[in-house]
UniProtKB/Swiss-Prot annotation:
Protein name per the record: Protocadherin gamma-C5
Amino acid composition bias (Basic residues), ranges on this chain: 934-944
Gene Ontology CC terms: plasma membrane
Provenance organism: Pan troglodytes (Chimpanzee)
Extracellular domain ranges by topology: 30-693
Listed InterPro entries: Cadherin-like_dom (IPR002126), Cadherin-like_sf (IPR015919), Cadherin_C (IPR032455), Cadherin_CBD (IPR031904), Cadherin_CS (IPR020894), Cadherin_N (IPR013164), Protocadherin/Cadherin-CA (IPR050174)
Signal peptide: 1-29
GO MF entries: calcium ion binding
GO biological process: homophilic cell adhesion via plasma membrane adhesion molecules; negative regulation of neuron apoptotic process; nervous system development; synapse organization
Length: 944
């Protein structure tokens, strides 16, 4: 071979390798090579490293190697070059037999990283096997009387090669008496027959030698031969013959074993042993047929030996022969074609082709949710199948070409039925009919078609004030009949505002479990009831929601100590109150007035005298009214200056308290001359320029105040005209314009120009959204008092007590001017126990639960005068409301007057010496018939 031949061969190998790689990548994605069987050891199969794209420098580090020892038996892999070569000769027939495809798997392992590559090596068939016959020689005896055209079957040759390398055709050595005829069987294999062309003559030639050659289709072709010796017999020159060379017979499947299929009947005209026949299967009868049928050699009867199944094979072919006993024996051949009849012995089958599972509950009626195929291995009517569905289901079966459809026939509702058990019944048309059941569980998937619903339309929660943030209020619960995300609920506070602030700043709702927590510390004095809207939303698409109301009631705690209004704390060093030494026992000295911002029992106040007083036995204090009276007559040796310390305690648990200190000066005065309100005022010094300036400023401020108050009175009258309050009253509810509230009270004393007390105004700023103003008015012409309720006022931060003229309020536009003592109100009546008595009828013992207030006229006037004097000298203020004369009243949503004595026992009406008694039907502040006195609203109407 020349030097140019090697590069050409190398180039061809490279082209073959590239073609192999392309085919490998396109077909299976794995490395695939082919090699011819019986290749010499060392024959290159392919370069694995090159095909994997590995660099030659990386082969050592990657340690390319075969994955198993079994692979190394036939192949070797070069670590240096990555070439896969044949290790030993491979015999395809021993590995794969007669299979048309022979693939030998090889595993290749690389390291760093560890990879496993599957390589398939196809072993190509090599025509290395020649056709061969079962015996090298065959002796055939043919009578000389054999007719021309007689056919004699010959043995077929066998070739283990496959494809074109197997037996392709036969040839017969030339002979004038015989020729070769080759038939093709159903499996495509050639079948040789020896044909007698002309009659034999034993005398001319007693033996004929024929060579039968079988040639395969390989390149180069291989062949095999057998020697056929034909012996010509002189006698028995008639061979057995059948009525027909092809016999057709039918038998039903599942025929019992032993059933007679056919009785062969061949004839031989010879006599004697030459005419005695033996029957047997021909050489071309398959082993399967021999297992199913049996042939009686003497009678020729064919019986069933095994199970006949139409589905296994509908047709059988039996080759039979009849041989006489002549010398030589003669044979006759026939073919029995057995047709198997179908019996309905196979139940139909239902095959699920497609099923939408689960099915949306919103699926429209008529939607296909499943496809089914049916089949029956039987034939004819035995193979005709119908499919039915169980009744009372919202589904129906619709037949189509080659399949059945499962459709919805009614609307679906998952909340009513979450799944359906569907029974499908397949039946064939055979007799008897066979059936097959198929059970399907069809789930219904949820659609968000149900809104969540709260278990309650209204939830109520209670919480004590001052509880820390995060306190659990209650738990709201909702349910949703949907499932999954459609039933996954999220709770929230619906965006509304409370007192100008978002509701979410007051409470927090756990979005997962609906627990409601306080976001802040609640103050009962600021807020008594909170209305919240809680919403719930599911997680469906689109989401559905629902709302419920939550009322949170804040419960009062005793967190406010009593606030002393009179005497005002810090005024201990102001001008003391004067008390004549001639005052009889039981005389009203002063009155301690206090209020409590709490409610209910926490606001019930009691008064007691502390031992720190100068002379504890000299004075008595009323437990419920705070009135300080003399316990005995004053003596000469009593100290001229008396300090009375009064303890004010509420009824809470634990109770809170405050103290009030009253300074008294004992004076020697004529007991007939009772002090006036003006006597308690300090006389101003002589007028100076400063006084003039003050008068001018007072006039200016008074004018401005008059204009302002006139405007406010007009608005008040407009509100009364709209139906809020009675005709002469100015007491109504008003929302606070500011969210800031104060828990203080500001007393405001208004005096006349002569120094006498005109009226006293106490503005209470409770901690909710309303203000209450209570005014005690004193007529300048009498020692009585007018007690009125003004409408709620929105005032600024309470300041110090105002005695300047600019603090005077005009009542001309809101209340009718009173120029004289008002007559007693006809809607207040005396009870029998309240009729006035003589002086000193008041019992000084305050150990009872509440004072009975049975005062005579003189004692009542003395109390009113003392109250006016206390306010006039600036040493005290009087708390308004129902506790103007000392009773602490709390008007809140949870405070009822049923728990305490009637507050009107401490309210004094001008022109009367008795306490108030409610007349039926007058609690709403309506004008009484025939009366024009001052009117007062019931405590039920005086809510904050």
């Amino acid at each position: 071979m020349g030097p140019k031949t090697l590069p050409q061969l190398a180039g061809k190998w490279q082209v073959l390798c590239m073609l192999s790689l392309c085919c490998w990548g396109w077909v299976s994605g794995q490395l695939r090579y082919s090699v011819v069987e019986e290749s010499e050891p060392g024959t290159l199969v392919g370069n694995v490293a090159q095909d994997l794209g590995l660099k030659m420098t990386d082969l050592l580090s990657r340690r390319l190697q075969l994955g198993s020892e079994e692979n190394g038996r036939y192949f070797s892999l070069s670590l240096m070059s990555g070439a896969l070569a044949v290790n030993q000769k491979i015999d395809r027939e021993s590995l794969c037999g007669a299979s048309t495809s022979c693939l030998l798997p090889v595993q290749v392992v690389t390291e760093h990283p560890l990879e496993l590559i599957r390589v398939e090596v196809e072993i190509l068939d090599l025509n290395d096997n020649s056709p061969s016959f079962a015996t090298p020689e065959r002796e055939m005896r043919i009578s000389e009387s054999a007719a021309s055209g007689a056919r004699f079957p010959l043995d077929s040759a066998q070739d283990p090669d496959v494809g074109t390398n197997t037996v392709s055709f036969y040839t017969l050595s030339p002979n004038s008496h015989f020729s070769l005829n080759v038939k093709t069987l159903k499996d495509g294999k050639p079948f040789p027959e020896l044909v007698l062309e002309q009659q034999l003559d034993r005398e001319a030639q007693a033996r004929h030698q024929l060579v039968l050659t079988a040639v395969d289709g390989g390149t180069p072709a291989r062949s095999g031969t057998t020697l056929i010796s034909v012996i010509v017999l002189d006698i028995n020159d008639n061979a057995p013959t059948f009525q027909s060379s092809v016999l057709r017979v039918g038998i039903p499947e599942n025929a019992p074993i032993g059933t007679l299929l056919l009785r062969l009947n061949a004839t031989d005209p010879d006599e004697g042993t030459n005419g005695q026949l033996d029957y047997s299967f021909g050489d071309h009868t398959s082993e399967a047929v021999r297992n199913l049928f049996g042939l009686d050699p003497s009678s020729g009867a064919i019986h069933v030996l095994g199970p006949i199944d139409f589905e296994e094979s509908r047709f059988y072919e039996i080759h039979a022969r009849a041989r006489d006993q002549g010398q030589p024996a003669m044979e006759g051949h026939c073919v029995i074609q057995v047709e198997v009849g179908d019996v309905n012995d196979n139940a139909p089958e239902v095959l699920l082709a497609s099923l939408a599972n689960p099915v949306l509950e919103s699926t429209p009626v008529g939607t296909v949710v499943g496809l089914f195929n049916v089949r029956d291995r039987d034939s004819g009517r035995n193979g005709e199948v119908s499919l039915d569905i169980s009744p009372d289901l919202p589904f129906q079966i619709k037949p189509s070409e080659n399949h059945y459809s499962l459709l919805t026939s009614q609307p679906l509702d998952r909340e009513a039925t979450s799944h359906y058990i569907i029974e499908l019944l397949a039946s064939d048309a055979g007799s008897p009919s066979l059936h097959k059941h198929l059970t399907i569980r069809l789930n219904i998937s949820d659609v968000n078609d149900n809104a969540p619903r709260f278990n309650q339309q209204l939830y109520t929660a209670y919480i004590l004030e001052n509880r820390p943030p995060g306190s659990l209020l209650c738990t709201v619960a909702a349910s949703d009949p949907d499932t999954g995300d459609n039933a996954r609920l999220t709770y929230s506070v619906v965006g509304n505002q409370v007192q100008g602030a978002p509701a979410s700043s007051f409470v927090y709702v756990n979005p997962e479990d609906g627990r409601v927590f306080a976001q802040r510390t609640f103050d009962y004095e600021l807020l008594q009831m909170l209305q919240i809207v809680v919403g719930v939303r599911d997680s469906g698409s689109p989401p559905l929601h629902a709302n419920t109301s939550l009322h949170v009631f804040v419960l009062d705690e005793n967190d406010n100590a009593p606030a002393v209004l009179h005497p005002r704390p810090g005024w201990e060093h102001s001008a003391p109150q004067r008390l004549p030494r001639s005052a009889p026992p039981g005389s009203l000295v002063t009155k301690v007035t206090a209020v409590d911002a709490d409610a209910g029992h926490n606001a019930w106040l009691s008064y007691s005298l502390l031992p720190q007083s100068t002379a504890p036995g000299l004075f008595l204090v009323s437990t419920h009214t705070g009135e300080v009276r003399t316990a005995r007559a004053l003596l000469e040796d009593d100290s001229d200056t008396q300090q009375v310390v009064v303890l004010v305690r509420d009824n809470g648990d634990p109770s809170l308290s405050s103290t009030a200190t009253v300074l008294l000066v004992l004076e020697d005065e004529d007991p007939e001359e009772m002090p006036k309100s003006s006597d308690f005022l300090i006389h101003p010094p002589e007028r100076s320029d400063l006084t003039l300036y003050l008068i001018v400023a007072l006039a200016t401020v008074s004018l401005l105040s008059l204009v302002t108050f006139t405007f406010l009175s007009a608005k008040c009258l407009q509100g009364n005209a709209d139906g809020d309050g009675g005709g002469g009253q100015c007491c109504r509810r008003q929302d606070s314009p500011s969210p800031d509230f104060y828990k203080q009270s500001s007393p405001n004393l208004q005096v006349s120009s002569d120094g006498t007390l005109k009226y006293m105004e106490v503005t209470l700023r409770p901690t909710d959204s309303q203000s209450h103003c209570y005014r005690t008015c004193f007529s300048p012409a009498s020692d009585g008092s007018d007690f009125t309720f003004l409408r709620p006022l929105s005032v600024q931060q309470p300041t110090a007590l105002a005695l300047e003229p600019d603090a005077i309020r005009s009542r001309s536009n809101t209340l009718r001017e009173r120029s004289q003592q008002a007559p007693p109100n006809t809607d207040w009546r005396f009870s029998q126990a309240q009729r006035p008595g003589t002086s000193g009828s008041q019992n000084g013992d305050d150990t009872g639960t509440w004072p009975n207030n049975q005062f005579d006229t003189e004692m009542l006037q003395a109390m009113i005068l003392a109250s006016a004097s206390e306010a006039a000298d600036g040493s005290s203020t009087l708390g308004g409301g129902a506790g103007t004369m000392g009773l602490s009243a709390r008007y809140g949503p949870q405070f009822t007057l049923q728990h305490v004595p009637d507050y009107r026992q401490n309210v004094y009406i001008p022109g009367s010496n008795a306490t108030l008694t409610n007349a039926a039907g007058k609690r709403d502040g309506k004008a009484p018939a025939g009366g024009n006195g001052n009117k007062k609203k019931s405590g039920k109407k005086e809510k904050k």
